[in-house]
Every structure is written in C-alpha cells, then in structure tokens.
Amino acid sequence: MRTIFASLTVPNYRIYFSGTLMANMGQWMARTAQSWLVLIILTHGNAAMLGWVMAVNFAPLLVVTPWAGALADRMSKRRIMVTAQIVMAIDAAILSTLVLTGIVQLWMVFVISAMDGLAGAFYSPATQAFVPELVPLKNLPNAVSLNSASFNGARLLGPGLGGLLIAAVGVGWVMAINVVCFIGFISTLLLIKADRLYTSPPASEKARVRDGIRYVKRRPDLVILLTIGFMMGTFGFNFNISDAVMATQAFGKGSGEYGLLGSLMGIGSMAAALGAARRKPRLRWVELALLVYTISMGLSALAPNYGTFAVLKMFVGWGAISTLITANVMVQTSVTPHTVSYTH
C-alpha cells in the first residue's frame, strides 16, 4: 500500500493530486453532459455530428502540442497550466450559461469545443513536464501512475454521476458543476510552493520542435511507444461517441445507463492505474494490455445486449489504460527533463 501511494508523501504532489481529482471529476461529468447535449438534444441522434464536435476538440492537440511543448520548456509550466485552466473554465461557464438560458445552438458548441481543445493543447505538455518537478526522480513512475489513477478514479464516478444528474437537474447544471471544479483546481495550482519544486537546470539551447523530432528519431523504442499512444488516442479513444450511440440507439437506454458505461470502464481503468503504480514498466505489459484491449473491443462490437456490452467495458478500460500508462511511464523515465514536454 505504501508503494502505491508513495508520491503522496510529497506535499506539493499531494496538493496537485487533490486538485486533479477534483478537476477530473468535473471533466468526466461535463463530457457526458456535452455528448448528451449534442447527440440527443441538438441533433436528435446524429452520431456523425457528435464525432465532428470531438474532432474539432482534438485537432489542436495534433497541430499545436509540439510547439506548446517547446513553450513549456522555456516558460513557467505552472503559469501555462493556470492560464489554460482559466480559459477552459471560461469556456465551460459560457456553455453552461447558453444551455441554462435555452439559447445554445450547435455552432456554438463547435466554437467552444475548439477553444477548449486549443487551451488543452497548451495544458497537456505543460502538465507532463510539471509532474517531474513535483517529486524526486525515484518517485516519478509512481507519480505518473497516480495521475492516471486520479483520472480514472474520476472516470469511475464522473460519467455515472453525470448521467444521473442529467436526468435529475439537466445538462446545464452538470456543466455548471464543472466550472466549480475548474476553480478548485486552479486554486490548488496556486498553492503549490515554488521553492519545493525539483526543477532541473536550463537546457543548453532553446527547445525547438525539430529538436524533439530529432531526439525521437534516434530512439526507436520511443518511436514505437509514441506511435502506440498516437494510434490509440486518435482511433481507439472515441468512447464518448461509441458509448452514447450504443446506449441510446443500439440498446434504447437513457442518460443514466449511458453514464454507467463510463463508470464501468472506470473500474477497469482504475485497476490498471493502481496496478501500474506498483510495478516497474515493461514492454511486455504494453503487449499484454494491447491484446486485452483488442479482444475486448472486438467482443464489444458483437455484444448482443446492454449487459454484455457493459461488462466488457471493464476489460476495455483495463487494456486501454494499462497500455497508455505503461507507455507514458517508459517515455517519461527514459528521456531528459528538457524533452519530456515535447515528446507528448
């Protein structure tokens, strides 16, 4: 047990962890609410349109992240994170207000989703590079795994709670809760003590995107791991779309059952994260996890009813998150501090 939660003995990381848990809860509830808003309320079952909303949100990650990673190597990572979170909180507040006032339209969701994705593209590499500053190097694999445990612990509760709240109080109020969670996370970032960070010396030359590409080219192992992460992130993590369509159109279920699918996936994801926190990252774990993920996804596509599909979500969650955590830890512990931010 001490091994699993070793990084929580570091005060700065403990503050950060509590904030991410709060933010992740809000995000998972909001993702459930936004998917329901687009698929059921605004488009009356148009899954393709929901896919486009997700694509608009994800596109900045592909385009901007390499340059954002180089920026994170030169500037205060915490400042970038706080700024990005403020922008995302404003986006969430605007969308919540539009829904609660009844004037929301699909094009508005597209614009807000794009802005949110752009802010996330700056936040992601900054937080990847910030985590190594929160803990001693020996605790880094554990810290990365606990970050995933926070994310997937929120996945365990967030979607199910979000689905129930949609039925009880409506989509707009679920999004309003997300705004409160953003404010809480921003507050915890500001509480982290700068004099207790494990900062590394400045790089000998400015971090540039081409430096990161050149570094990765010299490391075939990183090419494999980053390719796995890219392929899964691009093609394998469309659960907000597939789960919503399967729950509502294939099985005729409501918002509660849709949210439950995310929570069941969270059970497997949480088990994967806690398991990764205890063991050393090895390539064989990536191979095993990919096999479990592939088989369970294939069986999910053939599921004859909601119950079977729901049970398989736990195996999908374990396989997907085990793959990504192990690959992530292997990357973070095998690169120099100045390349962490632009190899993600």
Language model features: what each stretch is:
Residues F17, L21, M25, M29-A33, ...:
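A single, central transmembrane helix in multi-pass transporters
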Residues S35-I41, S96, L100, L157-I177, ...:
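Transmembrane alpha-helix termini and helix-breaking/packing motifs in multi-pass membrane transporters
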Residues V63, R74, I80, V87, ...:
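C-terminal transmembrane bundle of multi-pass solute transporters/carriers
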Residues E133, C181-A203:
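Helix-loop junctions on the cytosolic side of multi-pass membrane transporters
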